């Protein structure tokens, strides 16, 4: 599976095991993983320094943070993202409306499909 060959994917996930699994899934799909990072500050710095092509965000991060500021910056810059979360869809804030929602747990194929959908929808907007 090399659907994402060469695509730079920012991973924002604070759980080490989930981040490691996500990294593995993305590499197997051909992506170049940026991160993973588990804090908003680190994600914003990576976006500012070298913008990724797309991102995968967990909603709830450590220390009471959410990835909403990251989603806002990505949206402002026209960078598509997938929100991979276990949070019920009805309780996801509007800051994530431009992303593709992927409910945990998910299969690798579903992750790749969500990333492809996010890239296609962003391409249709631009």
Question: What spans do the regions from the language model cover?
Answer:
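Acidic, metal-coordinating helix/loop segments flanking the phosphotransfer/catalytic sites
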Residues: 36-54
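Hydrophobic/aromatic residues positioned on beta-strands within the core alpha/beta folds
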Residues: 82-85
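As written
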Residues: 94-102
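Conserved acidic carboxylate
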Residues: 13
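Non-catalytic signal-transmission and effector/linker regions of two-component phosphorelay proteins
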Residues: 1-10, 41, 103, 107-126
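Conserved phosphotransfer cores of two-component systems
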Residues: 48-50, 73-78, 90
